[in-house]
A protein has these predicted regions:
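Surface-exposed loop and adjacent secondary-structure segments within mature catalytic domains
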Residues: 195-199
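Cofactor-pocket helix-loop regions in the catalytic cores of large enzyme subunits
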Residues: 1-187, 193, 206-397
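Glycine-rich active-site loops that engage anionic ligands at enzyme catalytic sites
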Residues: 203
Length: 401
């Protein structure tokens, strides 16, 4: 929706916002650092609404817990949106200046009445009404979610439904307001930033953009296909069709993490060639033709990690990896070398500097600055740039870029 896969706010903003919706997230247990900031916000007067089928330890801190039925997130979100519109609380200024499709959205959610939503979600109509009015009228408000929203067959629709609420009320592009996916594992954000996506190059640059692609072609000495690749679900479909016959799996265990484990095991086991690179022999590794033992990135490798507020921080090697294990970067570079490609990296910093030369949002993040400042948030366009705490302030500019 916004063009880059990252939370729009910083952790500090949760300390100074007026309302926080924690949806499908038990952050007290899964994101304790973030939750520490959230509790400061609560103590400073922010209202906290927890949306979760379970009354989690995070929900215990909430002013209101909305215990919805499993899988009814879209019905609840659309009912909140409808109530905001019915009460005349939508932010018409923001809608008119920065959005498309309001009338279509309004028509779509019209059937999601409070009574309908109560039947579908199990959440009392009064609680839905309270959240809708509180969210729309709060001077600053944010929605934060985790895997309770994204680990569903309709995960994309879940996320879009939540983003619609933020766009409807204008709670984005300003300090203290935004949408914030709390990443499910360490450095998931960093993986996306580096271009581990089917339609993006590093720095969330579109692979279908000829000018951007040409920049990477020149730097890497290759011709990048001018079309998006497969996402994970599409890869398994391609295996089933016979269009994908070889897989290099790094730090991923789909035999156990896929919803349909039986299908995943069958398809991965039937590949012509499967390589697994991981810190121990996983269930997926047991099916592999080649297993490459990797170092643990959190203790045995140099590099960076990026957290859920887009903050890039240095990781320093503390231990030598055991046995024949090597760090991921070294393994990948050696595989490339044996295939006739020379990346020219001598260190993790070399690879990082290559990224900085190609990704404008990382350009100002030298290792020196990361060390001195304890981390920086992207975008950070040059070595004088402080990094941006929140994203999309452009949506409030005249005219909107």
């Amino acid at each position: 929706v916004f063009g880059a896969g990252g939370g729009t706010s910083s952790y500090r903003e949760t300390e100074e916002t007026d309302l926080i919706v924690l949806w499908g997230s038990n952050a007290r247990e899964t994101h304790p650092i973030f939750f520490h900031h959230l509790l400061r916000g609560v103590r400073n007067g922010a209202r906290l609404y927890a949306v979760d089928p379970r009354r989690t330890s995070s929900a215990e801190w909430a002013d209101v817990w909305l215990g919805l039925d499993v899988g009814s997130d879209i019905a609840l979100a659309n009912a909140i949106g409808r109530e905001i519109i019915a009460a005349g609380l939508e932010n018409r200024e923001f809608i008119d200046r920065a959005t498309d499709g309001f009338e279509a959205y309004k028509a779509k959610v019209e059937s999601y009445t409070l009574d309908f939503a109560e039947r579908e979600t199990g959440v009392p109509a009064d609680a839905i009404r309270e959240l809708a009015h509180a969210f729309a009228t709060a001077p600053r408000a944010m929605i934060c979610w985790t895997l309770g929203i994204t680990e569903h067959h309709n995960a994309v629709d879940n996320v879009v439904a939540l983003i619609n609420l933020v766009v409807l009320t204008g709670h984005v592009g300003r300090y203290g307001s935004g949408v914030n996916p709390l990443r499910g594992q360490n450095n998931v954000q960093g993986g996306g930033d580096m271009g581990a996506l089917p339609d993006r190059l590093p720095g969330f640059q579109h692979v279908e953009n000829d000018e951007l692609r040409a920049k990477f072609d020149a730097a890497w000495g290759v011709t990048i296909p001018p079309k998006r690749g497969w996402h994970l679900s599409g890869m398994f479909d391609a295996m089933e069709r016979g269009d994908l016959t070889a897989v290099y799996c790094i730090g991923e265990n789909p035999v156990q993490s896929e919803a349909d484990q039986k299908r995943a095991k069958h398809l991965l086991g039937g590949l012509e060639f499967l390589v697994v690179q991981d810190i121990f022999l996983t269930a997926t590794g047991e099916l592999a033709d080649v297993v490459l033992p990797a170092a643990a990135s959190w203790a045995e490798s140099e590099g960076t990690v990026t957290n859920s507020e887009r903050r890039v921080q240095r990781v320093r090697k503390a231990l030598e990896p055991p046995g024949d294990a090597r760090d991921d970067l070294g393994i990948i570079a050696e595989v490339a070398r044996r295939m006739g490609a020379e990346f020219g990296w001598e260190s993790a910093e070399d690879a990082w500097n290559e990224l900085r030369s190609l990704s404008p949002v990382h350009a100002g993040m030298s290792y020196r600055r990361l060390e001195e400042l304890g981390g920086l948030q992207w975008p950070c366009y040059d070595e004088d740039h402080p990094g941006e705490m929140f994203l999309h302030s452009r949506l409030w500019e005249d005219p909107v870029p």
